[in-house]
Amino acid sequence: MPAVCAFAQERKWEHNVYVAGGLLIDREWGKNETGVSMKLGYGLNYNFTEQWSIMSGLAIRRDAEHFFSSELYGEDSDDFLFLDIPVLMQFHASRWTFGLGPVFSFCIVNDSYHKDRVDSPYTELNGNDKIKNFYFSLQPCVRYHISRHFWLGVEGNIGLMNVNKTYDLPIPFGKKYLHNVMAVVGIRL
């Protein structure tokens, strides 16, 4: 009987590895540009109860505009690499998980300006970083556990900070917000 009770204990800690891909929405100067957002991550989940848990982890995310950009010819599309640290509260209902929380993002590969037009005042920005090295967003997510170890889901990142880096030049700098929506496939270890 003691062996049966030992195996019946609920798991407090869960390890997850996941990949995600989807749509990047780069909102700048009042217009939207779209691109691709891709992510590889690890999450450590701590279960408080059968219904509630908190998950944190690390993910590498690439946001690239140039795959679908209308600025492909003669303009400057964006391409960034981030280290993301999510902190999500999660509610578990049968096979479904619903999560919400902040994501702290550190830009580890920043894109720089490349303006081709010689008559543009923005050519002074050439070679300078486009965005700030840190920002945070809000991440809602929904997951469906297809088995004990595999899950599918959808998550989004809603950028809450203006990430545009400004310089001391006599030109206007607009606001830039990064958002994405991704499909996620994960393995619970």
Model regions and ranges:
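Residues that define the transmembrane beta-barrel architecture of outer-membrane proteins
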Residues: 11-13, 32-38, 79-83, 94, ...
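Transmembrane beta-strands of outer-membrane beta-barrel pores
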Residues: 21-27, 60-64, 93-95, 104-110, ...
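Membrane-embedded beta-strands of outer-membrane beta-barrel proteins
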Residues: 40-42, 85-87, 98, 140-142, ...
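Short glycine/proline- and aromatic-enriched beta-strand/turn motifs that initiate or cap beta-hairpins
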Residues: 8-47, 54, 186-188
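Flexible, solvent-exposed loop segments that connect beta-strands
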Residues: 27-31, 62-81, 108-134, 162-176
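Hydrophobic h-region of N-terminal signal peptides that target proteins for export
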Residues: 1-8
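Repeated loop/turn-to-beta-strand initiation elements of outer-membrane beta-barrel proteins
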Residues: 51-54, 95-98, 148-152
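Outer-membrane beta-barrel "beta-signal"
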Residues: 144, 148-150, 175-189
